[in-house]
Amino acid sequence: MGGKWSKSSVIGWPTVRERMRRAEPAADRVGAASRDLEKHGAITSSNTAATNAACAWLEAQEEEEVGFPVTPQVPLRPMTYKAAVDLSHFLKEKGGLEGLIHSQRRQDILDLWIYHTQGYFPDWQNYTPGPGVRYPLTFGWCYKLVPVEPDKIEEANKGENTSLLHPVSLHGMDDPEREVLEWRFDSRLAFHHVARELHPEYFKNC
């Protein structure tokens, strides 16, 4: 697996992976802007920064130093099932996401990198609510968010060199359930849409 991901896409991934590590605190269920892209080939006036949270977030990134241009260097498009599966396997092969403590900032960096290098609008990486394991709403994305065992959190916070701003030290402040979560690869998610089974209400209009 991999296709186009295995060649040109490797450029920049080690740098982005390191940034995620250091960061401080039209598949099913993509957002409205991605559905626009799928249907019209462009984001329509019904999805603007004033009416769409993902569009507003992207606009705000232009004000920040994110380390790479916010405007994608490839055509804008919605995330598809095949692209989500390929991306999952690419990241598994290259390493860096498996077992990484999740934070919103790290997810933002990943979303922006994918948006910039592949043109996938960043409204697809959403998960089921907690507590417990959070499953991806986008079918084909093979990373779930798994709560970290309390003893592992305690071990990670020992010693004088612990950064108070590292996501593991924030004790889940990013999370509504106050759980510390990590990305975990699960190849079964390419074939079994767990989120749809657990939360069919999220898929009524898909």
Swiss-Prot record:
Q: Where is this region: SH3-binding?
A: 69-78
Looking up Pfam families in the UniProt record yields: F-protein
Which segments carry the region annotation Binding to ATP6V1H? 148-180
- Residues the record annotates as the site (Cleavage) are W57, L58
Q: What is its main location?
A: host cell
Q: Where in the cell is it found?
A: Host cell membrane; Virion; Secreted; Host Golgi apparatus membrane
Instruction: Name a GO molecular-function annotation.
Output: GTP binding
Modified how? Phosphorylated on serine residues, probably by host PKCdelta and theta.
Chain location of the short sequence motif PxxP per the record? 72-75
User: Where are the residues of the annotated region Acidic?
Assistant: 62-65
| Residue ranges that the Swiss-Prot or TrEMBL entry lists as coiled coil | none
Task: Kindly list the residues that the UniProt entry marks as N-myristoyl glycine lipid attachment points.
Answer: G2
Q: How is this protein situated with respect to the membrane?
A: Lipid-anchor
- Identify the residue span(s) of motif Diacidic: 174-175
Which residue ranges does UniProt annotate as crossing the membrane? none
As for family, the record states: Belongs to the lentivirus primate group Nef protein family.
Q: What's the miscellaneous note?
A: HIV-1 lineages are divided in three main groups, M (for Major), O (for Outlier), and N (for New, or Non-M, Non-O). The vast majority of strains found worldwide belong to the group M. Group O seems to be endemic to and largely confined to Cameroon and neighboring countries in West Central Africa, where these viruses represent a small minority of HIV-1 strains. The group N is represented by a limited number of isolates from Cameroonian persons. The group M is further subdivided in 9 clades or subtypes (A to D, F to H, J and K).
Domains: what does the record tell us? The dileucine internalization motif and a diacidic motif seem to be required for binding to AP-2.
Whom does it interact with, and what assembly results? Answer: Monomer; cytosolic form. Homodimer; membrane bound form. Interacts with Nef associated p21-activated kinase (PAK2); this interaction activates PAK2. Associates with the Nef-MHC-I-AP1 complex; this complex is required for MHC-I internalization. Interacts (via C-terminus) with host PI3-kinase. Interacts with host PACS1; this interaction seems to be weak. Interacts with host PACS2. Interacts with host LCK and MAPK3; these interactions inhibit the kinase activity of the latter. Interacts with host ATP6V1H; this interaction may play a role in CD4 endocytosis.
Protein name in UniProt: Protein Nef
